[in-house]
Amino acid sequence: MHPYMRRSPNLVVLSGPSGVGKDAMLNRMRLDGASVHFTVTATTRQIRVNEREGIDYIFLSQEKFAEKRDRNDFLECALVYGNWYGVPKRQVTDAFDRGLDVLVKIDVQGAATIKRLAPQAVLVFVAPPSIHELERRLRWRLTESEESLALRTETARREMEHLPAFDYVIVNDALEEAVRQLVCIVAAERCRIPPRVVRL
């Protein structure tokens, strides 16, 4: 078999401002039965209404998270808006062993860290149609104070400046179309010549 025919699993990193719709996109892909592994991020923040332990996030105490961080159990971890978030390394390596592509949802800072650790990772930025629309979505969530809303909006403006570091951008103006584009990116990367080879 030609070396290019031996496909290695891809590490696809989905990033973008808070409230842009990353979770909605991944949930739709799950419902549609996408043949990828969706990592579940560990966090120290409080669980929100309708979130499920082990499905939306792995909720840990500060102490437990620190233990795992000290053992180097995370592919990447960072303090975001006062809470720790980390991608469990074991989830990624186990999925790779099964030949599955891996989708990681992470903040822009974390995406840059993963790209340094795994230069062959595929970085996808999800952008809002406008900052005004992003602010509207954050207000609709009813989880943010005015102070938090202002901070997240300003952070989003700064994060948009990192777009050139990404491989793809999806403007999430309509959920179905945004999901279709993400599915197409994953499919296209599977056909890439030469294939990406991710080493962790």
Segments (PLM) and residue ranges:
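Extreme N-terminal, non-catalytic leader segments
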Residues: 1-11, 34
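P-loop (Walker A) phosphate-binding loop of NTP-binding proteins
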Residues: 15-17
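Conserved lysine of the Walker
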Residues: 22
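Post-Walker A alpha-helix
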Residues: 25-26
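Post-Walker A helix-loop "phosphate-sensing" segment adjacent to the P-loop in P-loop NTPases
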Residues: 30-39
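ATP-dependent small-molecule kinase phosphotransfer cores
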Residues: 43-102, 108-112
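Conserved phosphate-donor/acceptor-positioning beta-strand/loop module used by diverse small-molecule
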Residues: 102-107, 116-141
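NTP-dependent small-molecule kinase module
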Residues: 143-144, 158-200
